[in-house]
């Protein structure tokens, strides 16, 4: 019987014993694009690096174990991963999508539907299972949720939504970027597919662009593998290695991100310059609204330790302004109606000393008048 290790152990051991010939503890980087054959029909299991690469395979097998899936797939970005999933469907298929969804996902779905006759996105408050069920029609083929959502941090009941998906024979896709398998395993809750922008917490150091898919079911996995090979938007060997290296400390980092975020959420609630704080009490992401839109630029220019940047999940604290960054492609009236106001800031709380983060926020707030 195979030993079932805890997730902390799986992460710490990622890549170890992956190269039996040398016994390398750190997974080697295989840069070769082609692999020799002994004869017709005789292969080492590797032929061409787009199809399969030894370093990428280590990452794909590791993320599959972490998410309790049947197979993992690594792509050149999170958006490339979503594009591959869209390729599984054809018009007039529809996806029910979280109304509070990452702006890049909105942009891809909107453009592909309007210009490429792709799946039609139907935006729903997926925090409400009844709202999801009310939106299901004969063309609905999948439900796509973020939990917590980006950037309003709304949580979805994956178990209840999975029951709905099964009842109506729909695929349930969960973006698990914010929580990672350390804090949530959607496949165990009934989802069919999990995706990650591995650029964020999984790689964790703001130095690798990564997309990941984990799926259950042989037929579905085979279809994804076929498209991955055909489309070719695969992760490079070096970025695969960076991700493997980064994920070794994922469990430790997530605990510190969460600990700091919980403290910062309480701190922000006590600040008179802050109108509201959005935090689901798990993970390292939160959002907050300033009292006055006119303060936003002054605040962003005033932070010194925290970086004003358009990403999340790294060791460093980042603040993002969704209105002009992540969600700028959503028309303003629609964006504001969804709750992504011009006073909203998204905060990826890093692993620095929490008192230093608080001090930076305080000195920035002091400039708001």
From Swiss-Prot:
Homotetramer. One of its GO terms (cellular component) is cytoplasm. It catalyses: O-succinyl-L-homoserine + L-cysteine = L,L-cystathionine + succinate + H(+). NCBIfam families: PRK08247.1. This is Cystathionine gamma-synthase. It comes from the Bacteria. The modification N6-(pyridoxal phosphate)lysine is found at residue 200. Belongs to the trans-sulfuration enzymes family. Binds 1 pyridoxal phosphate per subunit. Gene3D superfamilies: Aspartate Aminotransferase, domain 1, Type I PLP-dependent aspartate aminotransferase-like (Major domain). GO terms for biological process: methionine biosynthetic process; transsulfuration. Keywords: Amino-acid biosynthesis, Cytoplasm, Methionine biosynthesis, Pyridoxal phosphate, Transferase. It is found in: Cytoplasm. One of its GO terms (molecular function) is carbon-sulfur lyase activity. Its cofactor is pyridoxal 5'-phosphate. Catalyzes the formation of L-cystathionine from O-succinyl-L-homoserine (OSHS) and L-cysteine, via a gamma-replacement reaction. In the absence of thiol, catalyzes gamma-elimination to form 2-oxobutanoate, succinate and ammonia. It is an enzyme of class 2 (transferase). Its EC number is 2.5.1.48.
């Amino acid at each position: 019987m195979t030993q079932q290790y805890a997730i902390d152990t799986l992460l710490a051991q990622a890549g170890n014993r992956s190269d039996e010939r040398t016994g390398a503890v750190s997974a080697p980087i295989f840069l070769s694009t082609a692999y020799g054959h002994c004869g017709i029909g005789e292969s080492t299991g590797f032929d061409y690096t787009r199809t399969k690469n030894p370093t990428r395979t280590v990452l794909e097998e590791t993320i599959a174990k972490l998410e309790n899936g049947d197979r993992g797939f690594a792509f050149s970005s999170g958006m490339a991963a979503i594009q591959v999933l869209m390729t599984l469907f054809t018009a007039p298929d529809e996806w029910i999508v979280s109304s509070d969804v990452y702006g890049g996902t909105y942009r891809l779905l909107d453009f592909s539907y309007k210009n490429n006759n792709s799946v039609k996105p139907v935006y729903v408050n997926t925090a409400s299972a009844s709202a999801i069920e009310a939106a299901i029609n004969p063309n609905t083929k999948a439900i796509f949720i973020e939990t917590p959502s980006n950037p309003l941090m709304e949580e979805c009941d994956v178990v209840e939504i999975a029951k709905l998906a099964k009842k109506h024979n729909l695929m349930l896709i969960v973006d698990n970027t914010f929580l990672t398998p350390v804090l949530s395993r959607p496949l165990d809750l009934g989802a069919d597919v999990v995706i990650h922008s591995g650029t964020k917490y999984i790689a964790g150091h703001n130095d690798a662009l990564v997309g990941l898919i984990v799926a259950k079911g042989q037929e579905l996995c085979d279809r994804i593998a076929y498209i991955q090979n055909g489309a070719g938007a695969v992760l490079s060997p070096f970025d695969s290695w960076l991700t493997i290296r980064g994920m070794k400390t994922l469990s430790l980092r997530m605990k510190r991100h969460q600990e700091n975020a919980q403290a910062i959420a309480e701190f922000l609630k006590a600040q008179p310059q802050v109108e509201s704080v959005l935090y689901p009490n798990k993970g390292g992401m939160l959002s907050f609204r300033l009292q006055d839109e006119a303060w936003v630029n002054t605040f962003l220019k005033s932070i010194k330790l925290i970086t004003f940047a358009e990403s999340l999940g790294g060791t460093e604290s980042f603040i993002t302004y969704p209105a002009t960054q992540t969600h700028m492609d959503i028309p303003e009236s629609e964006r504001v109606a969804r709750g992504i106001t011009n006073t909203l800031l998204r905060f990826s709380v890093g692993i620095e000393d929490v008192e230093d983060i608080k001090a930076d926020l305080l000195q920035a707030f002091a400039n708001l008048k």
